[in-house]
Amino acid sequence: MKAGIHPDYAEITATCTCGNVIKINSTVGKDLHLDVCGACHPFYTGTQKVMDTGGRIDKFNKRFGALGKK
């Protein structure tokens, strides 16, 4: 490998919204904030829940909710 052309590889912290903290190695260089992780993802936990990111469902229903009603 050539010297001086590869990015730095360091340990960073990935923090999920559920509070789970994961230490990983990455070239990103800064801490990550995750929406879902293996501890809270519905596929891994076996639970189903609606994940409304930023009120998108409410915004959609407000714009197009009247079209479904006759």
From Swiss-Prot:
Give the gene name.
rpmE
Question: A GO BP term, please?
Answer: translation
UniProt source species: Shewanella pealeana (strain ATCC 700345 / ANG-SQ1)
Q: Does the keyword Phosphoprotein apply?
A: no
Enumerate the residues binding Zn(2+).
Answer: 16, 18, 37, 40
Keywords of this protein's UniProt record, alphabetized?
A: Metal-binding, Ribonucleoprotein, Ribosomal protein, RNA-binding, rRNA-binding, Zinc
Q: Which GO terms describe its molecular function?
A: metal ion binding; rRNA binding; structural constituent of ribosome
Q: Which cofactor does it need?
A: Zn(2+)
Q: What is this protein called?
A: Large ribosomal subunit protein bL31
Origin, by domain of life?
A: Bacteria
Q: Which GO terms describe its cellular component?
A: ribonucleoprotein complex; ribosome
* Family statement drawn from the similarity comment of this UniProt entry: Belongs to the bacterial ribosomal protein bL31 family. Type A subfamily.
Which Pfam families would you find in this protein's record?
Ribosomal_L31
* SUPFAM superfamilies given in the database record: L28p-like
